[in-house]
Amino acid sequence: MEIISLNVVPQCSVVTWSSKLATKRLVPNRSSLLFSGVKKSRLVIRSGNSDGYVVGENDDLGRIARRGESTSKVLIPGLPDESNGEIAARISHSHCEWKPKLRVHYEKAGCDNLDAPAVLFLPGFGVGSFHYEKQLTDLGRDYRVWAIDFLGQGLSLPTEDPTTMTEETSSSEDKEPFWGFGDKTEPWADQLVFSLDLWRDQVQYFVEEVIGEPVYIAGNSLGGYVALYFAATHPHLVKGVTLLNATPFWGFFPNPVRSPKLARLFPWPGAFPLPERVKKITELVWQKISDPESIAEILKQVYTDHSINVDKVFSRIVEVTQHPAAAASFASIMLAPGGELSFSEALSRCKENNVQICLMYGREDPWVRPLWGKKIKKEIPNAPYYEISPAGHCPHDEVPEVVNYLMRGWIKHLESGGFEALPLLEDTEEDWEESRIGREIEFPRDGWKKAVNLWLYGSNYTYWRGVRESFRSSFIRVFGGKSA
């Protein structure tokens, strides 16, 4: 890591990493470094004057750079670039059969790192293990890394139709085009509901039977909820939880264990077969949301940086929507009951069991805004809370260099028993407990230099202070940088 600190007394910190970068263009009047060859570099803090290359000048770090006040730049490695001779971890695909006809698809990398910590990634809604390719190829060089597809999503969809047609229906000319739209449930699919409780149990099986030891578990959006839920109910299987813009709510219907009387008021709990009315609604909704144009629009919403190539993610999502079980699985997911524990209850349970939690949130997420991450920070003050800008709902795919840098640093911090400093605290004497630390993070990507802003919020940084600062930042953006 290298920190270039402006107008401050230089200190020294040494971190080594390999890099090979051919810069296509150096921007005039901007600090740039050109690396050539694959070699070990000693990176230290440097002081000097610079105009500060900041992406997103409307935020706090952008205003600091324009005013010429003190700010810092942290240089981190990019993703492994095989075209430049760097070695990326190889990804392999596998399946395991949890229950009859229910195969769990997963990807893994770095399994030759026998003594390294185990890391498990859980996907968000509508995607799968493929969404963590940039973590598998990079973090897989140092750790043993897995990413799974939740049942009912990705490549963990049913391998057979969970329903059958009656003789009367099957003989009619108008046969259902989708699996799961039959009249009778197959024995193996009896009481099958793609719910939070099912996914929690799926993760338990995977950790116990496939990985075989406690893991560092990370989840984005829905995957974050499942990761926290799993850690709350199985803390002995978890070494730490990373929440990547985790959704704090899922399941709109009452859980039958938690609220049995209330649950009976809702006749269909998301199991197969789908009721006739649900079939008709599902067909209409599915026709819209599975349309490639709709998928492209959703990706445009959740990715802040529209220069990022999401073609591979787009094609994988479209591919999954064409599976015959996709529509019925979608209906089951959307109408499934909530979990036995709410997000807040799972968080409290993790706090009671001293489960280590780290928060990494994209600041420009239009769905799970950083406000939710700051509420978690309020409940667990000692949890490191990192905010990245510009980054949206999927920071692990939009700015994987930053997320991987934070993941490595956090795991090292825990593995060392706290001896290794958290990311951004390696070379600072700032009183970060009462405030927040902001840095400009620069990294190579596709031969160019790219920069984002990163903040670490202190343990005593209050929730309401964060709300006030967010309001102030929005106010300044609206009124053109004028302070109130």
Curated annotation (Swiss-Prot):
It comes from the Eukaryota. One of its GO terms (cellular component) is chloroplast. Residues 1-47 form a transit peptide. The keyword Nucleus does not apply. Keywords: Chlorophyll catabolism, Chloroplast, Hydrolase, Membrane, Plastid, Thylakoid, Transit peptide. InterPro entries: AB_hydrolase_1, AB_hydrolase_fold, PPH_chloroplastic. Optimum temperature is 25-30 degrees Celsius. Its EC number is 3.1.1.-. Its main location: plastid. GO terms for biological process: chlorophyll catabolic process. It is found in: Plastid, Chloroplast thylakoid membrane; Plastid, Chloroplast stroma. GO terms for molecular function: pheophytinase activity. Disruption phenotype: Stay-green phenotype during leaf senescence. Delayed chlorophyll breakdown during developmental senescence. Belongs to the AB hydrolase superfamily. Alpha/beta hydrolase dephytylating specifically the Mg-free chlorophyll pigment (pheophytin), yielding pheophorbide. No activity on chlorophyll. Belongs to the chlorophyll catabolic enzymes (CCEs). Interacts with HCAR, RCCR, PAO and the LHCII complex. Part of a SGR1-CCE-LHCII complex, which acts in chlorophyll breakdown. This is Pheophytinase, chloroplastic. It comes from Arabidopsis thaliana (Mouse-ear cress). The gene is PPH.
